[in-house]
């Protein structure tokens, strides 16, 4: 595009932004009064604290008597009663909303994580039946076994032998991507092993880039700006279109091969195909949604877990003791993959991972749109069209929810007097959502994380470089460790047993 056209577009964007500001801001502000400069929810404060948005929101929510504030982003809450109201009591009044759906629709279509109403109910019902079968759990465990025993552990063993420093986060991300693709549509993308095909490599790279670019839309304060860029096919929107085309092409190819196959497998795509004659686009949206949901969530949690545990060596010692106790009880040796039943016996490890999730939830903020006028249990009045957010990151740091030691990494808070895992209300710990939209993959996520963590802790000492250093947060679509997590691995003698 030539310079005059770019200048015209820039002026058009500015005009559109000004017009949108006039229309949109009144709909998002508090129904009682507009946040003014100097108030915690004001636009100036938001801009000033943009580099530390999550921790700033913790501060203003903790300072609010109801743990709820009105900002230029909408109404934000860390109040469990309000969360239950949104996600359960008045579930139908708080859909994802058109703004959220529109932002992600090019990438996710109307998949289960990007739809409301009857379309969502159909996918949810079908997916719920599949996730609760013994067959899918067995399939997940077998894939974890192959990925851990045949790929992840050998990589760690080579790193231990050479003494090299590796980025634990990056390695776990490659592991997680391979695993979620295998479970979703039974394709080996080979990211961890390096045996990826050209098609698989292009898909993986395009998926990662599309995920990052789609998040960029959230940085545009007004819908019109990125929509105009998409209309003119320029900048990030042009790149996004190209990456989405690559992802969709790969997914459609897999779907058509699977439909024409003589027999179907136990992966999620095969089970959906066996369920009914769904259109290719419907299936594509579903599997892309599942890959997005599982791609970085488990790897991010495991990364945060290993960093947090490095600050409390006694936690890792207790995890190792629990793993050894499970081995003795079941008569299995180190190096043999744990069974599903063995993984479920690891209550302290379950608690330690839950504690990492409390402090560093993969998705810190979740948004909803108010459909009809409403009032939260804490008295906050919400207008139709208002963006409403519940802040899982802040809720994990509320003294009112977790007590005086809320800032500490203390897995023991999740155990009962007998040492068994004690779940908390999902409205106090909404990391896996709650109500009708409760995450279907919750058990699957815990199974994978526990299997990986137990296998690594049993065989290696994970030495985090600069473990005393406070890790910065990288928050795009998932809350990750900024710059990765450099570690060195030392193989334990027990590994040979």
UniProtKB/Swiss-Prot annotation:
PROSITE patterns given in the database record: CYTOCHROME_P450
Biotechnological and industrial applications of this entry: The coexpression of CYP90G4 and CYP94D108 in the yeast strain RH6829, which was engineered to accumulate cholesterol, leads to the production of diosgenin, the main precursor for the industrial production of steroid hormones.
Parts of the chain that traverse the membrane: 6-26
GO MF, any single term: heme binding
GO BP terms: cholesterol metabolic process; saponin biosynthetic process; steroid biosynthetic process
Pathway given in the UniProt record: Steroid metabolism; cholesterol metabolism
Topology in membrane: Single-pass membrane protein
Distribution of this protein across tissues and organs: Mainly expressed in roots and, at low levels, in leaves, fruits and stems.
EC number: 1.14.14.-
Stored InterPro entries: Cyt_P450, Cyt_P450_CS, Cyt_P450_E_grp-I, Cyt_P450_sf
Compartment(s) of residence: Membrane
Entry keyword set: Cholesterol metabolism, Heme, Iron, Lipid biosynthesis, Lipid metabolism, Membrane, Metal-binding, Monooxygenase, Oxidoreductase, Steroid biosynthesis, Steroid metabolism, Sterol metabolism, Transmembrane, Transmembrane helix
Domain of life: Eukaryota
Pfam families associated with the record: p450
Positions that bind heme: 439
The UniProt record lists the keyword Transmembrane helix: yes
Family under the similarity heading: Belongs to the cytochrome P450 family.
Summary of the function given for this chain in its UniProt record: Involved in the biosynthesis of spiroketal steroid and saponin natural products from cholesterol such as diosgenin and analogs (e.g. furostanol and spirostanol), plant defense compounds used as main precursors for the industrial production of steroid hormones. During the 5,6-spiroketalization of cholesterol, may catalyze the 27-monohydroxylation of furostanol-type steroid to an intermediate product that undergoes a stereospecific formation of the terminal heterocycle to yield diosgenin.
PANTHER family to which the protein is assigned, alphabetical: CYTOCHROME P450 (PTHR24296)
Protein name per UniProt: Cytochrome P450 CYP94D108
Organism: Paris polyphylla
């Amino acid at each position: 595009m030539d310079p005059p056209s770019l200048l015209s577009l820039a002026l058009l964007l500015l005009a559109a932004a000004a017009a949108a500001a006039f229309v949109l801001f009144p709909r998002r502000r508090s129904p009682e009064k507009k946040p003014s400069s100097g108030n915690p929810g004001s636009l100036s404060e938001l801009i000033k604290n943009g580099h530390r948005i999550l921790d700033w929101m913790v501060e203003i929510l903790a300072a609010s008597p109801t743990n709820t504030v009105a900002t230029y982003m909408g109404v934000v809450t860390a109040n469990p009663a309000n969360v239950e109201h949104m996600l359960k009591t008045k579930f139908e009044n708080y859909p994802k909303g058109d703004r959220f759906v529109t932002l992600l629709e090019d990438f996710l279509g109307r998949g289960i994580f990007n739809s409301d109403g009857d379309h969502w109910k159909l996918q949810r019902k079908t997916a719920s039946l599949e996730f609760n079968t013994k067959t899918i759990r067995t399939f997940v465990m077998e894939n974890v076994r192959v990925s851990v025993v045949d790929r992840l552990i050998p990589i760690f063993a080579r790193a231990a032998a050479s003494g090299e420093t590796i980025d634990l986060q990056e390695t776990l991300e490659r592991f997680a991507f391979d695993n979620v693709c295998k479970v979703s549509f039974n394709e080996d993308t080979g990211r961890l092993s390096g045996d990826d095909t050209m098609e698989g490599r292009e898909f993986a790279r395009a998926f990662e880039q599309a995920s990052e670019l789609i998040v960029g839309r959230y940085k545009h304060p007004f819908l019109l700006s990125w929509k105009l860029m998409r209309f003119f096919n320029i900048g990030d929107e042009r790149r996004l279109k190209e990456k989405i085309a690559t992802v969709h092409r790969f997914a459609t190819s897999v779907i058509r091969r699977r439909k024409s196959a003589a027999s179907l497998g136990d992966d999620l795509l095969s089970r959906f195909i066996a369920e009914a004659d769904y259109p290719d686009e419907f299936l594509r949206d579903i599997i892309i949604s599942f890959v997005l949901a599982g791609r970085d969530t488990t790897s991010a949690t495991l990364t945060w877990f290993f960093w947090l545990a490095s600050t409390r060596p006694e936690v890792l010692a207790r995890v190792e003791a629990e793993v050894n106790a499970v081995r003795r009880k079941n008569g299995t040796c180190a190096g043999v993959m744990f069974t599903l039943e063995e993984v479920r016996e690891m209550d302290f490890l379950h608690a330690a991972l839950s504690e990492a999730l409390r402090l560093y939830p993969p998705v810190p903020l979740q948004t909803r749109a108010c459909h009809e006028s409403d009032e939260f249990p804490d008295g906050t009045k919400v207008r139709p069209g208002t963006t409403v957010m519940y802040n899982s990151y802040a809720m994990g740091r509320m003294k009112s929810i977790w007590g005086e030691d809320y800032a500490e990494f203390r897995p023991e808070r999740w155990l009962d007097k007998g040492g068994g895992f004690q779940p908390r209300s999902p409205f106090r710990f909404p990391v896996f959502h709650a109500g009708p939209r409760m995450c279907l993959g919750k058990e699957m996520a815990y199974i994978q994380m526990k299997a990986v963590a137990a296998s690594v802790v049993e065989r290696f000492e994970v030495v985090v470089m600069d473990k005393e250093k406070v890790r910065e947060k990288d928050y795009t679509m998932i809350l990750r460790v900024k710059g990765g997590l450099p570690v060195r691995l030392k193989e334990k003698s027990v590994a040979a047993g």
